[in-house]
Amino acid sequence: MLKKLTKIKTEVYALGQHISMSAHKARRVVDQIRGRSYEETLMILELMPYRACYPILKLVYSAAANANYNMDSNESNLVISKAEVSEGTATKKLKPRARGRSFTIKRPTCHIAIVVKDISLDEYQYLGVDFIDSFRCSKKLQSKKKYTAMSYHDMYTNGGIWDKK
């Protein structure tokens, strides 16, 4: 049996486009959650008093749901590996002014991408190849190695229980 080392997918993303908010204001919030665990991120976003927190919270929920559906991963093993904010197009509206004139109002938009990584999965796994005859070969995928007892750093160990939606 030959064994071949292959790279598996351990990251899942959620993308929010044309969110009506300044990219600078969204970056202030995104910089606080980058590199943190999923549960810690939920606590931070629910307690921060900024308007940018709600769309980012929805994207974090969506990325966790994508990881659960695509990789069958547990929420306690998820970490925000990448989070980036880029500027979108500015929507233009007209504001009526005196004497029949009008001024343009530019509303900035931004695109937010949240990438979630499962720390319990190995990045590489072996593919076993059985040669049945010289013309056909079948590949068997070994099961994913999951470490369920692995826990990420816990910032709040005072026993506070937070509601996870």
Curated annotation (Swiss-Prot):
- Tell me which family the UniProt entry assigns to this protein: Belongs to the universal ribosomal protein uL22 family.
Write down the superkingdom of origin. Answer: Eukaryota
Under SUPFAM superfamilies, the record lists:
Ribosomal protein L22
List the molecular function annotations (GO) for this entry.
rRNA binding; structural constituent of ribosome
Quaternary state and partners of this protein? Answer: Part of the 50S ribosomal subunit.
InterPro entries, per this entry? Ribosomal_uL22, Ribosomal_uL22_bac/chlpt-type, Ribosomal_uL22_bac/org-type, Ribosomal_uL22_sf
GO process annotations (BP): translation
Q: Which organism is it from?
A: Daucus carota
- Name by which UniProt lists this protein: Large ribosomal subunit protein uL22c
> Which CDD domains does the entry link to?
Ribosomal_L22 (cd00336)
GO CC aspect terms: chloroplast; large ribosomal subunit
Its chief place of residence is: plastid
